[in-house]
């Protein structure tokens, strides 16, 4: 074969030579194979796909109403008051309109529910779950603006309308100042507690300066939002206890607290969408006054940013400016509460399924944050004296939660059970699915006299109860296990749901049959006619 190709090439060159063609040049221009320089992208490694709950959850036409009682909270708006004899015991809790209210609503197990007709599902191959399809958060008490402040606030001078250059700050220039906070209305619904974010004190590298007076490094931290945590009031979401050592830069209610802001980005990107079915949010704020801080400035203003002054402007004032926030007017026209909301499609993969028979409702409402002033007389005299009266502050809150739940069923196929086990193995454990241990081949010991002191104790240890994974967090527990009702038309939210869904309530009363006297009189009239 090789000899044949050589002969062909020889005769080709001879022909080109006779024809007067440069055959060597044509030979060099022949196509030659070269490796491709283009980058080849291989497909990614296949991973398990997260699907919506609608893929494996079948909804029924059975709906239930559940509602809480009137929920009330009373306390001091700025701080909790401990017992003088026992500081670990709180006499008056801290209840502020600038706090999160996180309700952990407990639902009954539908698999242990007494249904009039159980033919709609097979308990051997299916399990029942609740789906939240409607909610209404009721808020009592009048609209009002709550005031917060500090009797020793680090406020040096007014930087908005100052007509002369201020003098240098003295040893202590703190003043008594109050203000209102940013206006916030918020509602978060999910079957897991919401996640918050705040800026805390980070860990500096070994080579960085971390001596006394150095600026601490910042780190964005994510934590669970608990009941009673403070919201962002207009001074940022941060750990004020760790990042403000003077305890005078912000009002009393947050100077030693952590202000958290919901991590909407993190909860929206959650794989299974359990923390955030949907949320309602309304925020507004404007700046009322402009001040600056007293104290030694840790970072000087660069000299290339200004020309040096003379006389009273030779020494620069502090450039640590700060505003006082204000939420402006509150109005009933911009309320998010006291109205129903229907969940048709959640923003995540969990379309309202209440895993673990629980649902979390997180509420913030600063439009009802009035702080009431109470006064008691300590000494009675004919003339008015300040020392004869004691002043107290209290804040009250009133809530009412109503739900519409839809009964759903899940077919326990191998793929579905594997998927649920990957998502949350506690769900299968609550459904009493588990691995059965193989029979033991060891010989067991059995004593005759089990109460004898001559042998080891034969008392079996009681089974340990399942530990609550959220027991270290603080929530407002709401038990609705005995407050479900199928008579939707007997409750306000139930009637709204029937109207919204186009259902009609079944009549409960039957028409009474005509009496014998009326029938006989009708017959007599017919005969006369």
From Swiss-Prot:
Residue ranges, compositional bias (Low complexity): 512-521
Name of the gene encoding the protein in the UniProt record: L1
Family statement drawn from the similarity comment of this UniProt entry: Belongs to the papillomaviridae L1 protein family.
Organism (species): Human papillomavirus 67
Location in the cell: Virion; Host nucleus
The organism's place on the tree of life at top rank: Viruses
InterPro entries found in the cross-reference section: Capsid_L1_Papillomavir (IPR002210), Capsid_L1_sf_Papillomavir (IPR036973), dsDNA_vir_gr_I_capsid (IPR011222)
Record-linked SUPFAM superfamilies: Group I dsDNA viruses (SSF88648)
Gene3D superfamilies linked to this entry: Major capsid L1 (late) superfamily, Papillomavirus
Free-text function comment from the UniProt entry: Forms an icosahedral capsid with a T=7 symmetry and a 50 nm diameter. The capsid is composed of 72 pentamers linked to each other by disulfide bonds and associated with L2 proteins. Binds to heparan sulfate proteoglycans on cell surface of basal layer keratinocytes to provide initial virion attachment. This binding mediates a conformational change in the virus capsid that facilitates efficient infection. The virion enters the host cell via endocytosis. During virus trafficking, L1 protein dissociates from the viral DNA and the genomic DNA is released to the host nucleus.
Keywords: Capsid protein, Disulfide bond, Host nucleus, Host-virus interaction, Late protein, T=7 icosahedral capsid protein, Viral attachment to host cell, Viral penetration into host cytoplasm, Virion, Virus endocytosis by host, Virus entry into host cell
Protein name (record): Major capsid protein L1
Positions of the UniProt region annotated as Disordered: 506-529
Oligomeric form and interacting partners: Self-assembles into homopentamers. The capsid has an icosahedral symmetry and consists of 72 capsomers, with each capsomer being a pentamer of L1. Interacts with the minor capsid protein L2; this interaction is necessary for viral genome encapsidation. Interacts with protein E2; this interaction enhances E2-dependent replication and transcription activation.
One Gene Ontology cellular component: host cell nucleus
HAMAP family linked to this entry: PPV_L1 (MF_04002)
Any one GO MF annotation of this record: structural molecule activity
GO biological process, alphabetically ordered: endocytosis involved in viral entry into host cell; virion attachment to host cell
